[in-house]
Amino acid sequence: NSSTQNVGDIAVDWKSGTIWVGTGENNSSRSSYAGIGILKSTDKGKTWTNVGLLDSHHIGRILINPNNPDEVIVGSIGHLYSSNKERGVFKTTDGGKTWKKTLFIDENTGIIDIQPVPNNFNILYAAAWERESKAWNVDGDGKNSAIYKSTDAGNTWTKISDNNGFPNGKGVGRIGLAVYDENTVYAFHDNQFRRKKDSTKSAKGSGALTKEELASISVDEFLNMKDKKLNSYLKMNGLQEKYRAENVKQIIRSSPGEMRPSDLVGYLKDANAALFDTPVIGAEVFKTTDGGKTWKKTHEGHLDDLYYSYGYYFGEIRVDPQDQNGIYVLGVPILKSKDGGKTFTSISKENVHADHQALWVNPKKQGHLIDGNDGGLNISYDDGESWIKLNEPAVGQFYTVYADNQENYKVYGGMQDNGVWVGNHNAKIDKSWHQTGKNPYESLMGGDGMQVAVDDRNPNIVYTGYQFGNYYRI
């Protein structure tokens, strides 16, 4: 019953039934909302108490010492849109009555992840993240993004990612951590440095759209181009978040005789020149086998189609507790590796939503996974070869709800990454549609579903859209 719906992390002491909740989302998107500090329940969630860190705004991680439930470590990311001091690593040894800041980098750098060594809470690894958001841009990298290590349960920290194989400098982005043992650690890095020109794979000869082709084709050829081909081109150049084939084509349609596909090259280039010509390196996995003394990239080449240009929205990695070479990385798809990150395969399936945010790997049964994504929850018992969709929890995030003015009115909802849906006002959801295939709600559009308006003169005309101002009449 607290005055927030935004959660960054949860930690539970199962023996005592004590639950710790770090409020404020840890994904630094434009729609990521601040929280109200740390909440604690000592009666399995019946009642809650705020135990401080109110100005942290966004919590990256909470860890409970399994041998002392009053000892808790918190990673605070800090404000998203401004600088502040209540960020870094905080520790309590009295159940949240008092807090001590044990690691502080600066007012723009917080802690996005902390992971303990299994069975040794004294050794902790933490990921610092320098980031700042504006209404018009997310800056998700900085020279203070780095990896730290503690050998005294979080009381003191040492940076372990300087000039030892891990990237340094202004292009270091969000980092996720997975710890197998005290020496073996994986780091999942959103590398925002630009790719070298000669390292960007050429699309020539592959049937993919090129800048040269785009500059020479006619308007009719462009409008008849398959959306998949154009969307692949936009993704390859890091523009997937802002542009889709539909709205790029609409730009051409809306200016007959005035704008050609060749103009689009310059238009997109001006919109984001650096990303257009030299995409960022993007997602990459590093590994240490000596407790952070040295780091080495696990794979050759780029992990394309995993992060695109918005790695600040992801950053989670897991290692199989029974197999140090079994790792999982989460992005738009979910990938797994069985050879320590040398090669990866996608385990995203047709009934699994994109954009993966959380993953539980059963420490006692290999192949048993629970995946949390922007479409809800999925469970697998065969290491991601097949998934069951858990569609019962009401976990949708609505941006808007709208009702038209008919007597037998319809209700519309725009949802985060689940599009726009409509149903009759008296529609009831039960499990019968699993048998009949007739869901009382209908999807009108994908993406981030936004505002809806219905023409009062003709309720069959609906105006709606998705993120970045892309609106349509249906």
Which residues make up each language-model segment?
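Beta-propeller blade termini and top-face loops
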Residues: 1-474
